[in-house]
Amino acid sequence: QNGELNYFTGRLFEKDPFIKYRNPECSRDIIPFELFINWGSPLILCEGPFDAMTIKRNAIPLLGKNIQKNLLKRIVESTVKKIYIALDTDAIKQALKHCEYLLNQGKEVYLVELDGKDPNEMGFSHFTKLIQNTEPIDEFELMEKKISLI
């Protein structure tokens, strides 16, 4: 932010490490890679910075499963129409919550179903195909998905 380092992360590449990522203890209410975001084009929200780097275009890592207040405000106030939510399979409840909120804000929302792998694991080509084949979620489908989790 303003030319200053505001976040970093480390990753182990060992097979089945106990701790895969190491993140600093600091506020996550930032917009990572903000300099590279086109707020007029579709956004892709993912969990981590390595996922965002794999996705390459207009991807914002949430640094977890939740959308922080600063980012949420920026999305709602922006002219962006389409938002793809690509959280890991274990974060489906949070993903549906984000879908519902953004739908209520008048955004066109797409829930990208990752089939057990995160974007970094599946790679750019596979993830791009998933995006291309994802349809917008509507209130009815959202409700069906929420009920299926009960």
In which residue ranges do the predicted regions lie?
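Residue-level detector of alpha-helical recognition elements and their boundaries
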Residues: 17-18, 90, 134
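Anionic group-transfer/hydrolysis microenvironments
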Residues: 49, 88-90
